[in-house]
Amino acid sequence: MCCLCKSLRRWSLSLLTCSLLAGSLSAQTDNEVQPDRPDHSEGTSVLSPRRLQIEWGIGASSGAHNMGLMLRYGLVPDLELRLEGLLQRPHRGAVQVSDLTLSSKLALFSGDGWIPAMTLVGYLNYAPLEEARRVTGDLTLALEQELVSGLSLTCNIGSAEGMRRLSLTAELGYNFTDRLSSFVEYYGVFGPAEHGCDLGLSYAVTKDFLVDLSCGR
């Protein structure tokens, strides 16, 4: 995601999150929840017009607790807008807003055979705790391919820290049932290099409500 390199530092030891998602404000019923949390990789799914999705999560690490919120809204076919914020509370300190991100997600290709689905994500990041370069912009290209039934591979390549670093992710996702799924993921930034990995489980309570649990370092 947009704050990948910051996440590497923030979760240098461990991460435990639980995310809740709520579905559509429109009359549509054919769309299932496909979250962009809690992993670092951007998926290729884009919300249909007038659909609102709320993604909320809480987490903990060796240095702080945090709470993140993402609002996703389908603007027109193949395009959604997102607003994401992160509140952080150090173990010794006050609650503070560490990141605020406005982003757009554009579906480029839905995928066909062995040609993967492709989505382009653009970010405008505001980091009030940074002394310099508080406002930055980044881009990410997301690719997703189903390998066999129930098993998919998602890869991201993009920029980080205002186009100053390269970010890469690779994620394998597996659906055990229609409701229960899992993922294992590598993520990293380069220049200089930092690496991490995480894994998680997701369970669809209903078609419009999903909970997830993840951990990593």
Segments the model singles out, each with a brief description of its role:
Residues 27-217:
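Transmembrane beta-barrel domains of Gram-negative outer membranes and organellar outer membranes
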Residues 1-34:
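Cleavable N-terminal export/targeting peptides
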